[in-house]
Regions:
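Conserved short acidic donor-positioning loop in nucleotide-sugar-dependent glycosyltransferases
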Residues: 22-25, 46
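Short beta-edge strand/loop motif at the mouth of beta-sheet-based domains
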Residues: 37, 46-56
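A beta-strand edge to alpha-helix "cap/lid" segment located at domain peripheries
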Residues: 2-10, 14-17, 23-24, 41, ...
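Short, well-ordered alpha-helical segments enriched in acidic and aromatic residues
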Residues: 24-41
Length: 130
């Protein structure tokens, strides 16, 4: 039933709907929107193969649901690109802040591949030269 519904939705809508599950801490709900063989490439860091590795990643890094601030979303064919900011609570209970650019590839209405560029924000921004 969910598959028929997904095929009628735009990929950008599917992604934002899936991310609502992440925001609520329902990671299994999110994973229902991914293909079984989903691949996540975190540029310069790691590659996750399949839902089991993604599930383990979420268990390790999402101590509580991450907080997203989506800046832009662009859909082109089977791809959706999203930029924004994300906050993750670390094991010490403090938030780590990141900028991100995610490029998602869809197959049959499900998220099949992610290429993520994630950059940690450190310290204060440099003072203005004006």
């Amino acid at each position: 039933m969910i598959q028929n519904k997904l095929l009628k939705m735009k990929n950008i809508t599917i992604l934002h709907t899936a991310n609502e599950f992440i925001a609520k801490g329902d990671y299994e709900g999110f994973l229902a929107y991914c293909t079984a063989e989903t691949k996540w490439f975190f540029v310069g860091e790691r590659i996750l193969h399949g839902k089991e590795e993604v599930r383990a990643y979420m268990k390790e890094f999402y101590q509580e649901p991450p907080v997203f601030n989506v800046e832009k979303s662009i859909e082109e064919g089977d791809f959706v690109m999203v930029t924004g900011e994300i906050r993750l609570r670390n094991k010490e209970g403090k938030y780590d802040h990141f900028d991100y650019c995610d490029i998602w590839r869809f197959e049959d209405g499900k998220m099949a591949e992610l290429k993520a560029f994630v950059i940690e924000k450190r310290g204060s921004p440099p003072p203005s030269s004006e």
